[in-house]
Amino acid sequence: MTVSSLDSLPQPLKDRLRNVRLLLLDVDGVLTDGGLYFANGGDEWKRFDVKDGAGIYLARKLGLEVGLITGKTSDIVTRRAEELGVVLVRQGAMDKVPALAELVREAGCSTAETAYVGDEVLDLPVMARVGVSA
């Protein structure tokens, strides 16, 4: 979606987008391709796209807080978050609503000022509580 195409959005959605201060993202299937890769030794791999990293960098440059909520726990996610300067991270959150409440509180904003991007059933309760979701 280009910036010029934002003109075609309904005014209430544009208003909610203008109020976003916190962008929260699921990891598997949103920042990765959703696959789980295991080496013979048991090491787990995840494939992150550099374009998503660039988007997170730009969101932070624009003044948005960015955070991650994921149902799995992985050193790889910790490393990627550190590389991107993302400090608002909750891993192992099978119930993501408490994680949402914690991160919103830490960011000093409200759920109405939060956008969330998810891709699975576990994300639906969070998506129902934030100002903007996809």
Regions found by a protein language model. Name each.
Residues 77, 119-132:
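Acidic, divalent-metal-coordinating active-site segment for phosphoryl/phosphodiester hydrolysis
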Residues 97-124:
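Conserved Lys-Pro-Asp/Glu-containing loop-to-beta segment of HAD-superfamily phosphomonoesterases
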